[in-house]
Amino acid sequence: MESLRIGNRTVSYRAYGRDVDAQRPPVVLVHGAGGNHLMWPAQVRHLPNTAVYALDLPGHGASPGPSTSDISAYSEIVRDFVDALELPWFLLAGHSMGGAIALDFALAYAYRLAAIMVVGGGARMRVASPLLEGVVHDFEATTATITDYSYHPDTPAAEKELYLRHLRESDPHVLYGDFVACHNFDVVDRLPTLTTPALFVCGLQDRMTPPERSIYLHNHVGGSELLLVDNAGHNVMIEQPQQVADSLQAFLAKVAL
């Protein structure tokens, strides 16, 4: 992986893209709580004719800590990351906590964005107390619960086991901080001021951030688009990767220069 020194942090990332169409904005992918860049499937990371940058937030994946427990602080890290890459204009895509980061970024730095894609997100992201406390006090059982609730009930066991293994590679204190960041996130009152083109994506069987939250976002962000994906839960981009990639491709075409 490549890495960038950003202030007192090092951010690792992978860059993808050949035969890039200069009229299409680059895509920056931000993972969710306790995740890393591999939470984005190959179909999304390897979009045709598009430069794609998938980062590991500090304390996640190949990026050393410290992490943070505040969405706006993560948003500033993303800002510094794209500054270091000299990306003046791009589409920011985020899953779950990454979706909160994308919304926060759009509200703070709209002039930098071509668009955002929020996958499995919400304007408010309260985390249930058993998950918050369990991450610290019973990591094994809590990560198993998170995994179960992150997928459609009919998802093959092997696929869920792979996700669980990735999740358990994370530092419990980093995952706890991520959940605190999500729990304190609330932009309900600010949604009417969001002017960045937005695509909201959610699995119809999402039990972590139910579809109603994406529908709410769509109804309160003018001109936004909504994709509800059947046979998918919270990790919709892993469960139905081609459908999510195709929708992102179509959305990119609309916001290209």
Annotate the PLM regions:
Residues N219-H234:
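Catalytic histidine neighborhood in serine/cysteine hydrolases
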Residues L194, F200-C202, D206:
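Short beta-strand/loop motif that positions the catalytic acidic residue
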Residues A232-A245:
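Catalytic histidine-centered segment of alpha/beta-hydrolase-like enzymes
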Residues A73-F90:
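Conserved acidic catalytic loop of the alpha/beta-hydrolase fold
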Residues A100-A144:
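Flexible "cap/lid" loop of the alpha/beta hydrolase fold
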Residues R9-P64:
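Conserved HGGG/HGGXW glycine-rich cap/lid loop of the alpha/beta-hydrolase fold
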Residues E133-T195:
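Conserved alpha/beta-hydrolase catalytic His-Asp/Glu region
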Residues H31-A33, F90, G94-S96, G203:
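Conserved alpha/beta-hydrolase "nucleophile elbow" surrounding the catalytic nucleophile
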